[in-house]
Amino acid sequence: MDSSRSSNSLDSGSSLTLGELACAALIPVLALVDAVVFAAAQCFQKRPPGLLPATLAARARRRAGGRLTFRELADLADESRCFSVNEVEALYELYKKISCSIVDDGLIHKEELQLALFRTPAGKNLFLDRVFDLFDEKKNSVIEFEEFIHAISVFHPNTPLEDKIDFSFRLYDLRQTGFIEREEVKQMVVATLLESEVQLSDDLVEAILDKTFEDADTDKDNRISKEEWKAFVLKHPSVIKKMTLPTLKDTTAAFPSFIFNTQVED
């Protein structure tokens, strides 16, 4: 992208430019979610004939050392508000693959998430830090399976817009103050440009930030509250257009008749 093209985008409304940058920031995690969908489909397609899901769940618990029961799977499906019990079980298969890639303890460590996203376990990455922090709801430096399900479900087409807006807000709220500050947005924009190998002049980046805060910071206190962010996103939906992956809904629709007839104990 050259400066003249970017300047034209800015002249026509920098919210579109910011939206493109925000979408670019989500590309690595979108790739992971796409991998989740593909792996889930493969889990269903390769299921041995006549093998009950109860048997598969028991195998999974033995291999991972976990104790997921049918009730736990059902509860996670209910919490997600979009995945079926069968899909949660399939996602558990993928979760285990990621969680044993470096440390085989049934939990996803930051290095394992980095390996899944960027094919390397080393190196500093602001985007990785933010994604890991958002996935790690308990703030115990690992991603547990229920946290994994919660994060993936945000991208489902049936997930309420409010949840998607909240996720995107927290992505930019680097210091977790409950507000998006200019420097935080700048850090994310610069990190996104570096990852995308897109070059923009410092003046153009500042102009994008100026326009964004002019539109979003309605009370002019040099920071964007959650309410202001919601209003901004509703006005400029391109900012979170990549927060919905139709393939997640396709996965749900692809297996509507698969009955989870399990005999695992509650």
UniProtKB/Swiss-Prot annotation:
Site (Involved in dimerization) location in chain: S196
CDD domains: EFh
Induction summary: By cold and drought stresses.
Biological process according to GO: calcium-mediated signaling
Tissue: Expressed in shoots, culms, leaves and young spikelets.
Transmembrane region(s): none
Name of the featured protein: Calcineurin B-like protein 10
Organism: Oryza sativa subsp. japonica
Taxonomic lineage: Eukaryota, Viridiplantae, Streptophyta, Embryophyta, Tracheophyta
Name of the gene: CBL10
